Curated annotation (Swiss-Prot):
Enzyme class: transferase
GO molecular function: 1-acylglycerol-3-phosphate O-acyltransferase activity; 2-acylglycerol O-acyltransferase activity; 2-acylglycerol-3-phosphate O-acyltransferase activity; 2-acylglycerophosphocholine O-acyltransferase activity; acyltransferase activity; lysophosphatidylethanolamine acyltransferase activity; lysophospholipid acyltransferase activity
Function: Lysophospholipid acyltransferase involved in fatty acyl chain remodeling of glycerophospholipids in the endoplasmic reticulum membrane. Selectively catalyzes the transfer and esterification of saturated long-chain fatty acids from acyl-CoA to the sn-1 position of 1-lyso-2-acyl phosphatidylethanolamines (1-lyso-PE, LPE), with a preference for stearoyl CoA over palmitoyl CoA as acyl donor. Acts in concert with an unknown phospholipase A1 to convert palmitate phosphatidylethanolamine (PE) species into stearate ones.
Topology term for the membrane: Multi-pass membrane protein
The protein's name: Acyl-CoA:lysophosphatidylglycerol acyltransferase 1
UniProt GO cellular component terms: cytoplasm; endomembrane system; endoplasmic reticulum; endoplasmic reticulum membrane; membrane
Organism whose genome encodes this protein: Homo sapiens (Human)
Note on domains (UniProt): The HXXXXD motif is essential for acyltransferase activity and may constitute the binding site for the phosphate moiety of the glycerol-3-phosphate.
Protein family according to the UniProt entry: Belongs to the 1-acyl-sn-glycerol-3-phosphate acyltransferase family.
CDD domains named among the record's database cross-references: LPLAT_LCLAT1-like (cd07990)
Gene Ontology biological process terms, A to Z: phosphatidylethanolamine acyl-chain remodeling; phosphatidylglycerol acyl-chain remodeling; phosphatidylinositol acyl-chain remodeling; phospholipid biosynthetic process; positive regulation of fatty acid biosynthetic process; triglyceride biosynthetic process
Motif (HXXXXD motif): 101-106
Pfam families linked: Acyltransf_C (PF16076), Acyltransferase (PF01553)
Length: 370
C-alpha cells in the first residue's frame, strides 16, 4: 500500500514512538528483573527463618514487576473496562480464574486489571505455555512459582502429573491464593478449526468465538486444592470454617476477555504501542466451588457449558459493543479500571534506584576481587 504525503509524518512519529517505547522497555527490564533476582538472593536467609514473610515480600516485588508491564499498555492508551460481578469481594479467598485465550495480550490485560484487587497478583500462580519460560520474564515466573505447561497430546499425561506435583510443592507453601488458567490450551486462531472438527465429530456445541476447553488441568487443580469436609463433599465458598488452616479452593471465576471488532492485542502491540488506543472488556462471573462437579465427565460437561455461555457473551458483545446484563438486572454496569500514575512512578523509581544500587554493589565487589 502506497503511503501518502499526509500519512508520512504520522507514520514517522509512530515509528519513532515505537522505537522509544522499545528502548524504554529494554532498559526497564535490565534494571527491574536483575534487581528482583538480587533481592531474592539476598533474602534467602529470611526464606529459611520465616518462609511466609519471604514469599510475602517476593510477592509484593512480583506485583510491582507486573505493574510495570501493565503500565506499558496503560500509557499507550490500552485500558480495561470490567463487567459482571465484582471479584474484589473474593480477593482474599482461594480461587481459579478460567480465561478464554485469544492472543499474548490476554496475559498483559490480566496483569493490568488485577492490579487493584489487593494482594491477588502477589499471591497468584499462572499456568502458561512453556514458551513464556524463554521470555525476558521467564526467570521471574520460575522464581515466583508459576507453572509452564507444554502443549501436545504426547506431553499431556506427563504435564498433568508435573502440575499435580507442582501444586503440592508450591501452592500452599508459598501462600498462593489464585490460579490463572487458560483451559482452551492455546490461542483461538490456532485451535478453532481443530475444536470445531472435534465438536462436529462428537456432537458437541459448535463454537466460533471460543474453543472447547480441556478439563485435565482443571481437574488436577480441583482435586489438589478443594478442601474436603468430613462428609466428603467439597467445601464451598459459604461453607463453615474447616478444622484445617485453609478452607481450600472456594471459587471459580469465569473470566471472558473481549476486544473491539474481535481484534486481540498481542504483546508486541502492548510494548510498541503502534495500535490506536483500545479499550479491552473483561467480564467476570463467580461460581462457588460447591456447585462445580469433581467427576471427570461431569466436570467436562460443566466446563463446556461455561464456554457455551462465553460464546453467547462474546456474540452479544461483538453485536452491541457491551456485555449483556446479569440475571435479575435490567442493565449491564461497567467499571473502568484505572492505574495510579503516582504508584507507577514510585515503583519505576524504586526499580531504577535499585538497579543503580545493585550495579554499584556488584561493581565494588568485582573490583575488590579482580
Amino acid at each position: 500500500m502506497a503511503i501518502t504525503l499526509e500519512e508520512a509524518p504520522w507514520l514517522g512519529w509512530l515509528l519513532v514512538k515505537a522505537l522509544m517505547r522499545f528502548a524504554f522497555m529494554v532498559v526497564n527490564n535490565l534494571v527491574a528483573i536483575p534487581s528482583y533476582i538480587c533481592y531474592v538472593i539476598i533474602l534467602q536467609p529470611l526464606r529459611v527463618l520465616d518462609s511466609k514473610r519471604f514469599w510475602y515480600i517476593e510477592g509484593i516485588m512480583y506485583k510491582w514487576l507486573l505493574g510495570m508491564v501493565a503500565s506499558w499498555g496503560w500509557y499507550a492508551g490500552y485500558t480495561v473496562m470490567e463487567w459482571g460481578e465484582d471479584i474484589k469481594a473474593v480477593s482474599k479467598d482461594e480461587a481459579v480464574m478460567l480465561v478464554n485465550h485469544q492472543a499474548t495480550g490476554d496475559v498483559c490485560t490480566l496483569m493490568m486489571c488485577l492490579q487493584d484487587k489487593g494482594l491477588v497478583v502477589a499471591q497468584m500462580m499462572w499456568l502458561m505455555d512453556h514458551i513464556f519460560k524463554y521470555t525476558n520474564f521467564g526467570i521471574v515466573s520460575l522464581v515466583h512459582g508459576d507453572f509452564f505447561i507444554r502443549q501436545g497430546r504426547s506431553y499431556r499425561d506427563q504435564q498433568l502429573l508435573l502440575l499435580k506435583k507442582h501444586l503440592e510443592n508450591n501452592y500452599r507453601s508459598r501462600d498462593r491464593k489464585w490460579i490463572v488458567l487458560f483451559p482452551e490450551g492455546g490461542f483461538l486462531r490456532k485451535r478453532r478449526e481443530t475444536s470445531q472438527a472435534f465438536a462436529k465429530k462428537n456432537n458437541l456445541p459448535f463454537l466460533t468465538n471460543v474453543t472447547l476447553p480441556r478439563s485435565g488441568a482443571t481437574k488436577i487443580i480441583l482435586n489438589a486444592l478443594v478442601a474436603q469436609q468430613k462428609n466428603g463433599s467439597p467445601a464451598g465458598g459459604d461453607a463453615k470454617e474447616l478444622d484445617s488452616k485453609s478452607k481450600g479452593l472456594q471459587w471459580i471465576i469465569d473470566t471472558t476477555i473481549a476486544y473491539p471488532k474481535a481484534e486481540p492485542i498481542d504483546i508486541q502491540t502492548w510494548i510498541l504501542g503502534y495500535r490506536k488506543p483500545t479499550v479491552t472488556h473483561v467480564h467476570y462471573r463467580i461460581f462457588p466451588i460447591k456447585d462445580v462437579p469433581l467427576e471427570t465427565d461431569d466436570l467436562t460437561t460443566w466446563l463446556y457449558q461455561r464456554f457455551v455461555e462465553k460464546e453467547d457473551l462474546l456474540s452479544h458483545f461483538y453485536e452491541t459493543g457491551a456485555f449483556p446484563p446479569s440475571k435479575g438486572h435490567k442493565e449491564a454496569v461497567s467499571r473502568e479500571m484505572t492505574l495510579s500514575n503516582l504508584w507507577i512512578f514510585l515503583i519505576q523509581s524504586f526499580a531504577f534506584l535499585s538497579g543503580y544500587m545493585w550495579y554499584n554493589i556488584i561493581q565494588y565487589f568485582y573490583h575488590c576481587l579482580f
